[in-house]
Design a protein with these regions (language model features):
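Active-site anion/phosphate-binding pocket segments in diverse small-molecule metabolic enzymes
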Residues: 1-152
Length: 152
């Protein structure tokens, strides 16, 4: 980053910079405008669409991953459930919907919950939602037996 390399270093890991070009921009302020940031795509199928309360009914407890989810009460909202979950991609903080107006609001091991109230397209059962992903998600996804990897 600063133009110099210690004499004894003989291996430089630049995987994320070449594959995604996210970290250099996000953490180090390096402008990576010339790099494609959409070379990996996570696609997940919508398996349910319903209007539901934005705040769960009942008591909120610790989930299977040791976290207590927090929800903002925004009234009844349109929700979509995807047939993919944390065991497939890691954390919801590491997947980024490409469709404007879609927000990832939660996930279990096997499912992901989206708020689609403000989505630009009308999602229906069987539709595919695309996500940009970060390096950690690539690690999970490429090691998951449930995920089909397609090279284009």
């Amino acid at each position: 980053m600063e133009g110099d390399m210690p004499e004894r270093i003989n291996l430089l890991r630049v995987g994320e910079g070449i594959l995604l070009a996210r970290d250099l921009d996000l953490f180090y302020g390096q402008n990576m405008y010339f790099m494609n940031k959409d070379v990996y795509t996570l696609k997940a199928e919508v398996i349910e669409v319903k209007d539901k309360p934005s705040h769960p009914v009942g008591k909120i407890a610790v989930d299977a991953f040791g976290h207590t989810p927090e929800y903002v009460d925004r009234g009844i909202r349109r929700r979509a459930l995807l047939g993919i979950g944390k065991v497939d991609y890691g954390s919801i903080d590491e997947i980024f919907p490409r469709d404007k107006g879609i927000e990832v609001i939660g996930a279990s091991s096997d499912h992901t919950i989206l708020d689609i109230e403000d989505a630009e397209r009308d999602l229906k059962l069987g539709d595919i939602v695309e996500f940009d992903i970060d390096y950690a998600s690539i690690v999970y996804l490429t090691n998951c037996r449930n995920v089909q990897i397609v090279f284009v």
